[in-house]
Amino acid sequence: VLRVVRLDYRALWWDEGRNIFFARLDWVSAAEISVRSGDTNPPIYRLLLGGWMQLAGASPFSVRLLSVFFGVLAVALLYRLAAELYGERVAAIAAALAAVAPPLVYYSQEAKGYPLVVLAAVWSAWLWLRLHRRLGVARSSALWAWFGIATLLAVGAHYFALL
């Protein structure tokens, strides 16, 4: 609920407008303009935003709603990760803190890739934990594939995921 309250209260700002601009372009044009303009943002969020805008429209509320979706999923996955590591009680506390954490709420209200990178990083960590716990057992190639997808999604959303 915190992520949706006043979602369209502020006007779209420069970075959000730039993401919407790139999201409306085809791959080739987006890459060409990105290189010429010196844009350093990876493409995954903008590609997802383009698909989202075809479904939900391009109003400030609808374009920001994608970030809300990613932010809520990140909290749910964080709960799952913490539950496997520390149990249900700690997981509930971790999820509650993440649900109200000001930076996570704030960035879930912008048409930017930050909630996606958080979601993908938590998903990647959860999959890594599952792979690590299967050291003595035959590892699933599907699990490795999902780990690779989650990690590439994180890096494709923001280069800081490499850190």
Feature annotation, model-predicted:
Residues 65-85:
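Transmembrane-helix motifs of polytopic, lipid-linked glycan transferases
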Residues 78-100, 119:
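Transmembrane-helix signature of polytopic, membrane-embedded enzymes
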Residues 4-9, 60, 64, 71-74, ...:
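Aromatic- and kink-enriched transmembrane "portal" helix at the membrane-lumen/periplasm boundary
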Residues 42, 64, 91, 114, ...:
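Residue-level signature of transmembrane alpha-helical entry/exit and packing/kink sites
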Residues 94-95, 107, 142-159:
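Membrane-interface alpha helices of multi-pass inner-membrane proteins
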Residues 4-12, 21-22, 28-64, 157:
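Membrane-proximal lumenal/periplasmic loop motifs of glycosylation machinery
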Residues 89, 124-146:
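Membrane-interface transmembrane helices that cradle and orient dolichyl/undecaprenyl
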